[in-house]
Amino acid sequence: DTNVGDPITFEITVNPTGQVNSVGNQIVSNGFDTTLVEFSTANINGTTTFSWTNDLTSIGLAASGTGNIPAFTAINTGTNPVIATITVTPTFENGGVSCTGPATPFEITVNPTAQVNPTVDMVVTDGDSVDIPFSTINTGGTSTYTWTNTDPTTGLTNTGSVSYTHLRAHETLDN
């Protein structure tokens, strides 16, 4: 004789691992504000928290934190762009069980302050064409040079702009 008891029913909940939606990279210039980084997830029926690390604190962002990353004033006092890798780790919690998901990186690039090296004053003959050299010590990108001329009788374009790493603006000057 075998005695069989009444069956019982119980539920097993299988939580997903933590997941974070893709975060876009940011590119800002020295002294300008980044945009708020709001982390989100596709997971439901629980709570997802986010922790993050920053591998380059010199940009003005702490080495680590939790939750969203507020806007901050980016710092780059050098002459090259700097790139910080921010790595966010999601943790899904439900029913007292935490499930950590894979870490996901994104980048914040901080460009240096734009600068132009001084050009020398020039004396030219009426009607001569002249190259005006522009250069910068900044590297790793393209600089845009913009000028304003307050004396249009020289023949130099009143305003202008060109984008190059190192360039010469070519103008014919008249008096």
Task: State where each predicted segment sits.
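Short, solvent-exposed loop/turn segments at the edges of extracellular beta-sandwich modules
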Residues: 1-3, 91-98
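A short beta-strand segment in extracellular, disulfide-stabilized domains
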Residues: 33-41, 128-137
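Solvent-exposed loop segments of extracellular immunoglobulin-like
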Residues: 45-54, 139-151
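Short, solvent-exposed loop/linker segments at the N-terminal edge
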Residues: 27-33, 122-128
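Proline-enriched interdomain boundary motifs that mark the N-terminal boundary
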Residues: 17-24, 113-120
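Exposed beta-strand face motif in extracellular beta-rich ectodomains
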Residues: 80-86
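C-terminal edge beta-strand
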Residues: 7-14, 101-111
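Conserved small/polar residues in nucleotide/adenosyl-binding loops
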Residues: 165-172
